[in-house]
């Protein structure tokens, strides 16, 4: 629990005043499959009330940014990575102050992951990017500040460089769920030392 402040305004569930500051990319974005990327973005711009010329310019700018500027196929034929890139373009349409991404690189191949991370790096100067991930190399590549959750509670939070310095170690502690897991670890890492056993 707690409060969320975006651009100086408190976020209140059910109220729309802060929504204009926020863009959101879900883990698996959904689109109208019969549209092209350009048609879909224009449609979203119309729904939000953008003026025609502004809509056209912004859509062109965003499609170029995410590498879909020359894409003319319908969305139904897009790869997962292409859909993620279109999702980022849609989330940036209203020039948000905060972009929230839920697992933006999950289930992507290495090339797709790199493309998404490159886009997120490129837009860091325009907006604050908050994203969740289990891929620590992605965190190291683009994050300046991090928060590690443990069972839904923030365990460690701060500048990534400070956390890496504070927790630097040549030792690692692993907890196993059962004796079989422990046996596998001992066979894989013969120099491993067992320091305790929970009953």
Features from the language model and the residues they span:
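Conserved ABC ATPase "signature" region
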Residues: 42, 46, 53-70
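Hydrophobic anchor residue at the start of the ABC signature
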Residues: 88
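Catalytic Walker B motif of ABC-type/P-loop ATPase nucleotide-binding domains
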Residues: 99-102
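Conserved ABC transporter NBD signature motif
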Residues: 2-13, 17-18
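Conserved catalytic motifs of ABC-family nucleotide-binding domains
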Residues: 95
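ABC transporter nucleotide-binding domain
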Residues: 115-199
């Amino acid at each position: 629990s707690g409060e969320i402040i975006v651009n100086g305004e408190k976020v209140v569930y059910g109220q729309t005043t802060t929504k204009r500051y926020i863009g959101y990319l879900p883990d698996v974005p959904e689109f109208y499959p019969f549209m092209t990327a350009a048609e879909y973005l224009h449609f979203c711009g119309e729904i939000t009330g953008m003026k025609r010329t502004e809509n056209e310019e912004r859509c062109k700018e965003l499609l170029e940014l995410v590498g879909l500027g020359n894409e003319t196929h319908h969305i139904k034929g897009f790869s997962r990575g292409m859909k993620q890139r279109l999702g980022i373009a849609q989330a940036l349409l209203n020039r948000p102050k905060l972009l929230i991404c839920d697992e933006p690189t999950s289930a992507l191949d290495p090339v797709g992951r790199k493309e998404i991370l490159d886009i997120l790096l490129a837009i860091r100067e325009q907006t604050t990017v908050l994203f969740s991930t289990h891929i620590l190399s992605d965190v190291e590549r683009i994050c300046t500040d991090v928060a590690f959750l443990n069972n839904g509670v923030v365990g460690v939070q701060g500048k990534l460089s400070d956390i890496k310095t504070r927790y630097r170690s040549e030792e690692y502690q692993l907890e196993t769920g059962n004796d079989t897991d422990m046996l596998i670890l001992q066979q894989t890492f013969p120099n491993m030392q067992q320091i305790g056993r929970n009953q």
